[in-house]
């Protein structure tokens, strides 16, 4: 009985350690608000190939991000989506601060395909016109004052 309990406790500690590592890999850099980090990760008015575009994101992380979506629209247009009807987030049913874009936008989906060394991340690019769903929150003091509610998470593309 004792070895089984001890083994279970070790497994639990390992699981907790791995989950905290996963959270730290997806955490935003401390110097940015959630909206600023959203803008860096997901707003790109002029499409670039993913291998180049992802450098702006990967330089703040200790690894090559596996995948990412760039919306080819303005931050102000995405802020306007925050005014659409609230809905449960399709990507996380425990959140109800999501909003559907209502219109399709051009976007680029990036998928890591090459070496996973931070200095040499290689991506494939897929272009599409799709709807998107964003989570929005009240602005942080570091966010532009003209936007009381700002996008903080790209939940889903549809």
From Swiss-Prot:
Residue positions annotated to bind substrate are: 65-69
Which leading EC class covers this enzyme?
lyase
Keywords per UniProt: Endonuclease, Glycoprotein, Hydrolase, Lyase, Lysosome, Nitration, Nuclease, Signal
One GO cellular component term: lysosome
- Database matches in PROSITE patterns: RNASE_PANCREATIC (PS00127)
Catalytic residue list? 42 (proton acceptor), 153 (proton donor)
Q: Which InterPro entries match?
A: RNaseA, RNaseA-like_dom_sf, RNaseA_AS, RNaseA_domain
Q: How does it assemble?
A: Interacts with and forms a tight 1:1 complex with RNH1. Dimerization of two such complexes may occur.
- The name on file for this protein is Non-secretory ribonuclease
